[in-house]
């Protein structure tokens, strides 16, 4: 009986550990690649100047916090059907924050 309980407990703990992508270290290189392939072109059109980075650095930016940046990346992913996994969203968020926003975690 104890062995079954311990096995069940181990299984639950392992499942919990594998289901916590938010604790994983973001892959900045992947975030940059995704930004260049799936975000830059649309942002370049929206800026009106052909520079996709301008949307991140404009003075009237809607992004005022790291939490807001995460929401904006998720919104773009959903609305534009970019097919990004949650880990990819985290990578893009981390890249944009490091490159442009510099919000404290």
Q: How should these model regions be labeled?
A:
Residues 1-10:
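Bacterial N-terminal signal peptides that target proteins for export
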Residues 9-19:
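Bacterial N-terminal signal peptides
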Residues 19-34, 81:
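Electrostatic cytochrome c docking/interface patches
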Residues 28-32, 40-74:
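Gly/Gly-Pro-rich "capping" loops immediately C-terminal to redox-active cysteine motifs
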Residues 36, 44, 78, 97-101:
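Residues at helix-coil transition
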Residues 36, 66-74, 89-93, 97:
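An amphipathic alpha-helix signature
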Residues 61, 77-80, 86:
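Long, charged/polar, soluble alpha-helical segments
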Residues 82-105:
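C-terminal capping alpha-helices of c-type cytochrome domains
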């Amino acid at each position: 009986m104890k062995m079954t309980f311990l096995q069940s407990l181990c299984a639950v703990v392992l499942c919990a550990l594998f289901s916590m992508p938010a604790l994983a270290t973001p892959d900045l290189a992947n975030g940059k690649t995704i930004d260049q392939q799936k975000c830059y072109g649309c942002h370049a059109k929206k800026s009106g100047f052909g520079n996709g980075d301008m949307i991140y650095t404009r003075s009237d930016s809607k992004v005022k916090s790291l939490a807001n940046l995460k929401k904006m990346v998720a919104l773009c992913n959903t609305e534009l059907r970019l097919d990004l996994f949650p880990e990819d969203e985290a990578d893009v968020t981390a890249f944009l924050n490091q490159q442009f926003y510099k919000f404290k975690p």
